[in-house]
């Protein structure tokens, strides 16, 4: 599920996550998510399976699929894989080979939003107040990271469905803050944030990109090549 349900009796809503985590355990023990919402749900459900015996018992009983699962899978975000498995230094070297890198010297602001960092005790993704992983990624792409106050604040999330005006106000605060600090564009790792930042921008607008889009641009990978 794309939303983590906090009620302890909401077992059924988390079974798809448990099933994915269990399958990953049986196929190498690691699960990488490109989407921050998916990452958030998988990481939190995995923690539930490891720390909440009652929930784990109910989930395993419902699934009734071979060996019980108790949170053994390591859940990673795509950014963590790029940093810790491939290495930002390796990416930076490959980027330098692209002499026509359109990102070189460009001022780009990282937008973290909520789901990558919170709840911090479970996510353990980065410093929840002063994260650096996306800024380090921006540097590896040959661009210049712009740090601004609203980068960790909520864009409105799913509230855009019921209260578009509120989401527009949130996005305006983010966009104006980033632009004031010199950002020429924003980069995010959350599809919902990407949608909100693009669709709910009103007075202040900046180009907004997904992490994989700018990675491809920096490496000189064309769209038709990426589809192969």
Give short role names for the model-derived ranges:
Residues 1-228:
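Iron-sulfur cluster-binding electron-transfer modules in prokaryotic oxidoreductases
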């Amino acid at each position: 599920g794309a939303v983590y349900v906090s009620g302890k009796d909401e077992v059924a809503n988390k079974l798809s996550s448990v099933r994915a985590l269990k399958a990953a355990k049986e196929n190498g023990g690691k699960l990488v998510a490109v989407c921050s919402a998916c990452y958030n749900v998988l990481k939190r459900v995995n923690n539930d399976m490891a720390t909440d015996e009652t929930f784990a018992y109910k989930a395993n009983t419902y699934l009734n699929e071979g060996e019980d699962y108790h949170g053994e899978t390591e859940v990673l975000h795509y950014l963590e894989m790029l940093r810790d498995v491939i290495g930002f230094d390796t990416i930076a070297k490959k980027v330098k080979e692209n002499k026509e890198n359109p990102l070189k010297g460009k001022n780009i602001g990282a937008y973290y939003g909520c789901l990558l960092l919170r709840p911090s005790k479970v996510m353990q993704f980065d410093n929840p107040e002063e994260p650096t992983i996306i800024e380090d990624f921006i540097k590896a792409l040959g661009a210049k990271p712009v740090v601004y106050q609203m980068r960790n604040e909520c864009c409105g999330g799913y509230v855009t469905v019921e209260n578009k005006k509120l989401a527009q106000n949130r996005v305006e605060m983010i966009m104006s803050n980033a632009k004031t600090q010199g950002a020429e564009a924003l980069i995010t790792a959350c599809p919902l944030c990407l949608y909100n930042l693009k669709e709910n921008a009103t007075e202040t607008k900046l180009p907004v990109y997904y992490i994989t889009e700018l990675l491809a641009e920096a490496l000189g990978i064309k769209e038709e090549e990426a589809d192969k």
